[in-house]
Amino acid sequence: MAKVRLNLLNIFQLRINQKSIDYNGKTVGDIISQFLSEYRDKLDDELFDVKKKEFNAQILILLNGRNIKYLKNYKTNLKDGDELYLSYALAGG
């Protein structure tokens, strides 16, 4: 198991009232599952689709700055010291 830091950005930081949380896990999915088991009640349905059991399309999960969608998504393996970032994608002009 790897010791990983989950960094919470924008809406997640506001809802959870923390900047980061340390977890132990083997994959990105392990870390996200632990996070949701602790904090699901603080997230709106717009952020998390209960039926699909996944974050909505606007949620961005980065592993060391890389989008997990371009890796192995939730099955991406982790190593000690990895940093995950959980964010709501924002755009402006």
Could you describe each region identified by the protein language model?
Residues 1-92:
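Ubiquitin-like/PB1-type beta-grasp interaction modules and other compact soluble beta-rich domains
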